[in-house]
């Protein structure tokens, strides 16, 4: 009887341990939409809270110099003075005052690992820090890089491998790669738009761009887009203009745009010449992620998607 009781207790403890492990959830950050961007507030290195911009296309964690030195958030890192180095972002050029490389703790159980650039006059006020999500690590899951992004519910969560395995069957799966400008992550997929005449398809790499407020930008300079436009010469292209009348691009009004096998009715697809260095045919923007639940597994270069 005593042996049976011992085995029962052991089985219960083992089962509880496995259950606890499988249900371990990473840290969740509540997002706020600020203009055309998403931000969250979290402690940096346990020193001070910062407003943090969610980014996908920057090479390092960026921090405003005035905030860095007034708050002491990077006081434990070895900062090297940068000489005459600059960083161009969204048409603006910032002076890099200091650089570092290492681990920056964000919140309670999340870490950023990589380069750190301290910038002069980096939008101090709206946000103090910007972080590229592909370098966020889950401290509760052996440093895994799996980010669950649910912009519809204003949520960014670090998702453990066990949690992902339990839900990924409910999502469509696409591969990602970094065969792009500056090694940004892109989804290998296709876009099919229906403009009321016929469906038209463009396949290739579509870069993830949280700096793009639209559903999709097509990059005019790429061979794929040039071929797409030539093959669809009957498609109506409308001019995109500024309030002053300056033409800044073109756009296509669609009855439906299907991207990554998810349908977006009455979508607008923008054709731009303003991103001349980008090499992918398309950039997927925030309106896509506001209508989907995306799980980005940067360790395995896979994205799981589900429309909402």
Language-model features: where?
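Bacterial Sec-dependent N-terminal signal peptides
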Residues: 1-25
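Pepsin/retropepsin-fold aspartyl endopeptidases
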Residues: 20-308
């Amino acid at each position: 009887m005593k042996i049976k009781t011992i085995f029962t207790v052991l089985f219960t403890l083992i089962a509880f341990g496995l259950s606890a492990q499988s249900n371990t959830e990473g840290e969740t950050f509540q997002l706020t939409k600020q203009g055309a961007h998403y931000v969250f507030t979290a402690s940096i290195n346990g020193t001070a809270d910062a407003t943090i911009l969610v980014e996908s296309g920057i090479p390092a964690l960026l921090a405003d110099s005035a905030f860095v030195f007034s708050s002491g958030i990077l006081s434990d890192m070895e900062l090297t003075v940068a000489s005459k180095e600059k960083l161009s972002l969204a048409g603006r050029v910032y002076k890099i005052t200091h650089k570092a490389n290492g681990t920056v703790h964000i919140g309670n159980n999340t870490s950023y690992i990589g380069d750190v650039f301290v910038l002069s006059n980096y939008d101090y006020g709206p946000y103090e820090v910007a972080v590229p999500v592909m370098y966020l690590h889950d401290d509760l899951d052996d440093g895994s890089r799996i980010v669950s992004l649910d912009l519809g519910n204003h949520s960014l969560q670090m998702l453990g491998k066990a949690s992902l395995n339990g839900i990924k069957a409910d999502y469509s799966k696409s591969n990602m790669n970094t065969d792009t400008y500056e090694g940004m992550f892109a989804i290998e997929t296709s876009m099919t738009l229906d403009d009321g005449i016929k469906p038209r398809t463009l396949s290739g790499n579509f870069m993830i761009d949280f700096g793009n407020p639209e559903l999709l930008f097509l990059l005019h300079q790429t061979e794929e887009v040039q071929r797409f436009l030539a093959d669809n010469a009957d498609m109506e292209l409308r001019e995109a203009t500024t309030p002053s009348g300056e033409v800044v691009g073109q756009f296509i009004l669609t009855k439906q745009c299907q991207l990554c096998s998810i349908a977006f009715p009455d979508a607008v697809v923008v054709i731009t010449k303003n991103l001349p260095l980008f090499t992918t045919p398309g950039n997927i923007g925030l309106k896509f992620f506001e209508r989907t639940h995306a799980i980005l597994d940067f360790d395995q270069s896979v994205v799981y998607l589900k429309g909402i």
